Amino acid sequence: MALSRLELRRVIREILSDNVSWPDSTINAWINEALRDFSNYFPRITSQDINCTQDDRTYSLYECEGLREVLSVEFPQGDDPPRFVSRLSEKSAKFIAGPYYDLPFIATPGTIVLGEYPNTGDQIGVLYAGDHPLPTSDFISITVKERHWGALVLYVQWQAIRELEMDEAREPDDSNIVLSMLGLNSSRAERLYRSKLREYKATEADGGPAGPWVMDGQDRIY
C-alpha cells in the first residue's frame, strides 16, 4: 500500500524522538534528498502509453517522468501475446519499416523514433526506469515501496545528525566531547544507510521485465 509523505514524516519523527527541533519543511527537504539518492539505486519502474497519429514515427517522452532508462517498448500495444520491438540505430538500413525503435535524444524529456509507420489509434507502450517523484504535499503518496522505507528513514536520520554536528562545530563545546560523539554518530549513520541499501540490493530478486528475443544468425530451429 502506498503511504503519504505525512505518514513517512511521522515515522521519521518517532525514530528521531523529536517533534520540535526540526520543522516539517526541513524534514520534507531531507525526504526529497533521500528520494533523489534512493533513485540512483532503486529507480521507479513504471510505464507510459503514447498515442500515435497516422504515419508519424517520432514521439516525445516528456510524459515519462524522471526518465533514466527505457527498459522495453511494445508496439502496437495490446497484441496478444505482446509484441516488443528492438532498439536499433535509426541510421541502420534495416530500421525503416522494421520492428525497431531508437532513442536518438535519450536525455529527458527524450524522443522515441519507430521504424514502422503507425496508424491513428495505435499506442506505444514504454516501460522505463525513472526517478521517484518528489511529493509536493503531505497527502501525495511516496512511490518507494514500503519495505524500503527503512533506507529513507536512515537517510533523514543521517542528515539530522549532520546538522547537529554542524551546529556544534559553530558553537563548540570547550571539551570537544560533544562534537566528537556527534562525528562518530554521523559517520555511523551514513554507514547504516549505505549498509541498508546493500542489504536491499542483496535481497531483491534479479528478475525484471523481459525484452524481445532476437534469434542469432547461428541459431537453429527444429
Mark where each language-model region is:
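Hydrophobic transmembrane signal anchors and adjacent membrane-proximal interface regions, especially
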Residues: 6, 47-48, 69, 86
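Structural recognition of short helix-loop-helix hairpins that underlie histone-fold modules
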Residues: 12-22
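Solvent-exposed beta-hairpin/edge-strand motifs
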Residues: 65-87
